[in-house]
UniProtKB/Swiss-Prot annotation:
InterPro entries xrefs: Dup_hybrid_motif (IPR011055), Glu_permease_IIB (IPR036878), PTrfase_EIIB_Cys (IPR018113), PTS_EIIA_1_perm (IPR001127), PTS_EIIC (IPR003352), PTS_EIIC_1 (IPR013013), PTS_IIB_1 (IPR001996), PTS_Sugar-Specific_Components (IPR050558)
Segments traversing the membrane: 126-146, 162-182, 193-213, 225-245, 260-280, 303-323, 344-364, 376-396, 409-429, 442-462
Chief location: membrane
Domain (PTS EIIC type-1): residue spans on this chain: 117-476
Record note on domains: The EIIB domain is phosphorylated by phospho-EIIA on a cysteinyl or histidyl residue, depending on the transported sugar. Then, it transfers the phosphoryl group to the sugar substrate concomitantly with the sugar uptake processed by the EIIC domain.
Gene Ontology annotations for the cellular component aspect, listed alphabetically: plasma membrane
Gene behind this protein: ptsM
Designated name of the protein: PTS system mannose-specific EIIBCA component
Keywords: Cell membrane, Kinase, Membrane, Phosphotransferase system, Sugar transport, Transferase, Transmembrane, Transmembrane helix, Transport
UniProt GO MF annotations: kinase activity; protein-N(PI)-phosphohistidine-sugar phosphotransferase activity
GO biological process per UniProt: phosphoenolpyruvate-dependent sugar phosphotransferase system
Active site annotation, chain numbering: C28 (phosphocysteine intermediate), H602 (tele-phosphohistidine intermediate)
Amino acid sequence: MASKLTTTSQHILENLGGPDNITSMTHCATRLRFQVKDQSIVDQQEIDSDPSVLGVVPQGSTGMQVVMGGSVANYYQEILKLDGMKHFADGEATESSSKKEYGGVRGKYSWIDYAFEFLSDTFRPILWALLGASLIITLLVLADTFGLQDFRAPMDEQPDTYVFLHSMWRSVFYFLPIMVGATAARKLGANEWIGAAIPAALLTPEFLALGSAGDTVTVFGLPMVLNDYSGQVFPPLIAAIGLYWVEKGLKKIIPEAVQMVFVPFFSLLIMIPATAFLLGPFGIGVGNGISNLLEAINNFSPFILSIVIPLLYPFLVPLGLHWPLNAIMIQNINTLGYDFIQGPMGAWNFACFGLVTGVFLLSIKERNKAMRQVSLGGMLAGLLGGISEPSLYGVLLRFKKTYFRLLPGCLAGGIVMGIFDIKAYAFVFTSLLTIPAMDPWLGYTIGIAVAFFVSMFLVLALDYRSNEERDEARAKVAADKQAEEDLKAEANATPAAPVAAAGAGAGAGAGAAAGAATAVAAKPKLAAGEVVDIVSPLEGKAIPLSEVPDPIFAAGKLGPGIAIQPTGNTVVAPADATVILVQKSGHAVALRLDSGVEILVHVGLDTVQLGGEGFTVHVERRQQVKAGDPLITFDADFIRSKDLPLITPVVVSNAAKFGEIEGIPADQANSSTTVIKVNGKNE
């Protein structure tokens, strides 16, 4: 039997349109990133239905991001093993796929969308090196805190051991322009190694020997202003754009037979001087200009920046618009020696981590395994790694009320950051492990603690879901729990139990207790080709589930089925069944039919807020019912008087156990009208 990893990987690939629809595939810390030929044939809803998938995010006209969380690398490697995908490697694409992926340069994307996409995809592959370097910095700052060394002392005053340790993180930032040049060129479809070689030329000992930063020297009879390009990001970005156009022009005029030799030759010959004379100084000027503007705002009032930054990040990160700020942080470290954005950014991160911690605690209380796994993964990735995407896509973007719990934490934490005027003296990812990199670290600790606990307590006090979402989640948990209990009962049942069940079903004199026991033990499974017809549990008009004015039901998140616009006022059992859940408020009931199909009947939308008023419940949990037995009676006029929709979803909650499930609309449905057909699964 295929593993869960393989099954999910196959599911993703199939619903992306298969290997023939994919032109390139990469991954970052949390997301699988695909470029596809035809985005219209991608079934986003079906991909998102897999429990292992945290979210699906379209990017531009050809990009698709599938959010997997911290195990993304495992899924990436598994997809590479599937038929038709073995030729893909991280970051590589065929020439034709590059043209498709980077068509945005020629007008398929708006320039703003493409600019942010360009920055995001340039920095994404470097994330691993930056994460590793940031933790090495943290260890050295801790050594400074305990008096073992002076983190900011010149290297010639450091012991040899610490000089070596400093080289381990400085290598990433010193040679960052080379990495940026490579990934930026790759994103644009230019040669990544030429993209790396251009900034590398400006970091060689020979170039540095020309003079100090700010000096002017004469090269080719022209004045050249020298700059320190170590740690710079804007010069290699701009140089990569120039390289794209130079390569494109050269390929038009150089015969294909000799392009491999002369395109890189002329590219280097043109782009290195162009970068040294013009593009490099211009890029440094752009970075300094943006940095100076933000510094002026910070100098005018740290409060403004400290509040705005954490309030903006929850909206920037889902769109990938936070990457430009990362570039500015690195620029600040290089030019000012410190950064004033990372501290306030920590307020957003820890408000986010506090929120998912609250979700984790609630999921433990409710025994909600699915949310416990999602929230635990997000919490650990955030607190230990400073990565917010698992929390963002696993919780925040799935439940709209979460932002009302998140933003107060961002605001409160941002205010504290403003009071202490937090600065970072190294580029790090804001996690518990990197607290010592902030100054004053105690003020920063107070700020992130405030952000964390404000959002966490708001979740614990007010929940993170709407009333409907909460009740449906609890209903599903209860149904799953009951299913586990029934499986145990089935496993412990004697071989004679199914026979007894058959006898009880056929004989008129079988007792109720025996019938209840054998109904649980039998728990039949539909064979391939077998069909169960489910009649309407109440009178009314049966309409497609997609027409329900609730995104959770309409998208089939709680299972496929049908919706009834009621004309009657009584919910009845559509078949012999066991009641597995009844809401105290009376607005919902879940049944396990003797066929093994589990259905949820939800009377109206947002009716939970009535607190049971207008509903009369006739059954209780674990009760055996016969077809036609009344389950719930409701006062339709009273519910309408509260301006609540009466449309009633009827969904199959254990759909994964069966094959195709079809909802059948009907103008006048009643207890003899088939509204759902459930087919046995083909093994």
